[in-house]
């Protein structure tokens, strides 16, 4: 299965959720780190948290390829920011979706 194109230049949709240590701190760092995400071709369509559990984040993004997010998160500079943001990476669930 080719997840890299879906027939042309169409972006891949990523839907995910994860826990953070503190929503306000994580969101501030997420917003401040938008430049590197945009530089990697990653577009954020939605980011929010649960009303009942404010430290549970839900996110919808578009990426150039199915593995773009993983590559971005593994970059040492980005990994450092992600760790400092309080993102509990072991709780992350991401799904590659169609339109």
What kind of feature is each model-predicted range?
Residues 2-99:
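Short S/T/G/P-rich N-terminal loop/turn motif that feeds into the first structured element of a domain
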């Amino acid at each position: 299965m080719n997840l890299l194109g879906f027939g042309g230049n169409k972006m891949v949709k990523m839907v995910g959720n994860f826990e953070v240590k503190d929503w306000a701190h994580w969101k501030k760092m997420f917003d401040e780190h938008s430049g590197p995400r945009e530089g990697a071709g990653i577009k954020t369509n939605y980011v929010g948290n649960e009303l009942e559990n404010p430290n549970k984040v839900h996110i919808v993004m578009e990426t150039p390829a199915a593995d773009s997010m993983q590559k971005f998160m593994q970059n040492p500079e980005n990994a450092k920011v992600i760790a400092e943001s309080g993102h509990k990476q072991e709780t992350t669930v991401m799904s590659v979706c169609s339109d």
